[in-house]
């Protein structure tokens, strides 16, 4: 009987350790070290606010303005004030922190631009599953464009990943933000 009890205790301890390590790995997967208008930041810098992460770039002609407008409209309609949009630039050659931050705040005042170095951008986009590619535009003043995926990523107030939202209709985005606030 003692052996059985000991085995059960060991299984419970091992399960607890596994769950704790797994939880820490999930938190690390979505963490980052970047620059913002206020200096260096990590996901923890935004604790206390719900977060919506979005990857794009300032010179984006269509997807970024549309997505940021859609998210901002849903947030305004829901009247949620403690939600931060984290706009992570994919164009680190052209987007400086100040211009990027102004761009994000144009759509939603409680936004922050995140700018990463090459290595961190590569790591973060892989962790989040963001797809992007620099596309040469030979006969354009812009020289290149950035083709990219358009999902938004929802996080609770402690920086825990909640959901990736790729169906970016107004109704769906509003519903997913409501679910984030009500359930997390």
Residue spans of the language-model regions?
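N-terminal "domain-start" segment that seeds a small globular fold
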Residues: 17-47, 69-70
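Thiol/disulfide oxidoreductase modules built on the thioredoxin-like
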Residues: 122-176
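Extracytoplasmic/luminal low-complexity segments enriched in Pro/Gly and acidic/polar residues
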Residues: 181-184
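Structural microenvironment flanking redox-active thiols in thiol-disulfide oxidoreductases
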Residues: 68-124
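Extracytoplasmic
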Residues: 29, 47, 82-85, 147-150
């Amino acid at each position: 009987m003692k052996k059985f009890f000991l085995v059960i205790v060991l299984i419970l301890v091992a399960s607890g350790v596994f769950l704790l390590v797994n939880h820490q790995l999930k938190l690390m997967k979505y963490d980052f070290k970047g620059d913002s208008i206020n200096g260096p930041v990590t996901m923890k810098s935004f604790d206390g606010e719900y977060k919506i992460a979005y990857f794009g770039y300032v010179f984006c002609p269509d997807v970024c303005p549309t997505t940021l407008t859609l998210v901002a409209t849903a947030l305004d309609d829901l009247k949620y004030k403690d939600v931060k949009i984290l706009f992570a630039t994919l164009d680190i050659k052209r987007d400086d922190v100040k211009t990027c931050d102004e761009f994000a705040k144009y759509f939603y005042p409680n936004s922050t631009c995140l700018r990463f170095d090459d290595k961190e951008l590569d790591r973060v986009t892989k962790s989040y599953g963001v797809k992007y590619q620099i596309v040469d535009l030979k006969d354009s003043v812009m020289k290149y464009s950035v083709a990219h995926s358009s999902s938004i990523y929802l996080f609770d107030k402690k920086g825990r990943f909640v959901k990736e939202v790729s169906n970016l209709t107004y109704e769906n985005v509003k519903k997913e933000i409501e679910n984030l606030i009500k359930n997390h």
